Each structure stands twice: as C-alpha cells, then as structure tokens.
Amino acid sequence: LREHLIRDPCREGRRPVLMNNWEATYFDFTADKLVDIAKGAQGLGIELFVMDDGWFGSRDTDLSGLGDWSVNQEKLPGGLEALVPRIQALGMGFGLWIEPEMVSESSRLYREHPDWALGVPGRPQARGRSQLVLDFSRQEVRDYIYTAIRKVLDSADIAYIKWDMNRSLSDVWSAALPANRQGEVYHRYVLGVYDILERLRQDY
C-alpha cells in the first residue's frame, strides 16, 4: 500500500509524533490555554501540536459553527497568525482540525444555502452529531468550501490537517439532480471530496 497508493512526498516520510487538545479541552479553550498545553508536552518528544474542534465560527458546542470556517477571534485573538508562531517557538509544528463535509443548521452557511445539504425532499433531514452533510457532488458547494479552507490555511504556517468526518452519509439526495439521477450522488460525492483534496494537495 505504501509503495503503490501513497503519493510522494509522503510515501517515505516518517510520521511526526503529535498531540492534540481535544480530550484536554473539548470546545473550551483559548490561545493561552493551548500554549500552556503545548509547553507541558515540550519535553516529551512531541513534534506536532494539532488544534482540534472549536476554533472557528460560533463553535462552542457540537450544535453550531460547522460551515463557517473563520477563526473565532474571542478564543484566538489575532487569529492563527498570532497563535502558530507561539507553538512553533516551542519547537513544534502546528496542525489544524477541520470537518469540511459537514454543516450546522445554525451556521450562516446553512441559513444562506439550505439546499446545499443532502436531504430527501418532503422528509426531515437525518442528523448525526447534530450536523448535516454538505452536497459535495455540487461544484458550487466544493468551490465555496475550498475557498474558505484555503483562506484559513493561507493565514499561517499550517503543517498538518486533521480532516474529520463525525457521521455517516444518509438520506443521500441532491437538490441539483433530478429524481432519475439520484443514484449518481454517492459516486459524485466521493469524486467531490477527491476534487477538494487534490486541489489542496496541489496548493500546499
């Protein structure tokens, strides 16, 4: 698998020893708290510090925030531009958690584009971890998410991405396709995920 499926330059590289803050803080953290955690790990051989869920939008619980990929300035004054150098000064790279395939119903993104979430017309949308799934079969959805994530990644020296997905696909129906083509959505969705991954991989 490593020789034939994993692409260069990752194929031969040694994986860094990393830690993240999730179990230590869940959604309740500040920049100073994260730096304190990183300092505590400094002498343990940790090479990469990953900031987990809760750094963006109104993400104080798992009921909100997904889809609004802008840094929460109350938690992280000065944004990633201010936080990342503080972590790097401890001799660690900086990694970032994202869950770009998902959206919260209370998010600005969902309020503006409710049709961008998968869901069968006339039926309540299925929720997992209080979130819906964005329709990555649609180009405009992918372009929006790609642009939002790239803006975040361009703001600081991000060495690693933790791409999460905390629920399964269900009620897979795209508002962009007629009923007789809904069987294509699963396949088109996966191709859409590959599209964003490929673009980000080429960028960075």
Regions found by a protein language model. Give the residues of each.
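Beta-strand-rich recognition/accessory modules
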Residues: L1-D8
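Aromatic- and glycine-enriched glycan-recognition loops and surfaces
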Residues: T25-R111, R142-Y144, R188-D195
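Core alpha/beta catalytic barrel or barrel-like domain that forms the active/cofactor pocket
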Residues: E12, M19, E47-S58, W97-P100, ...
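Flexible hinge/switch segments at interdomain interfaces of large molecular machines
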Residues: D8-G13, G57-S58, L118-Q125
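Short, well-ordered coil/turn segments that N-cap beta-strands
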Residues: G13-V17, G45-E47, Q88-F94, D157-A159, ...
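A short alpha-helix capping/helix-coil boundary motif
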Residues: R14-L18, D60-S64, R127-S130, S174-P178
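Glycine- and acidic
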Residues: P16-T25, L34, L66-S70, S130-L134, ...
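Active-site neighborhood of glycoside hydrolase catalytic domains
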Residues: N72-A89, Y110-Y204
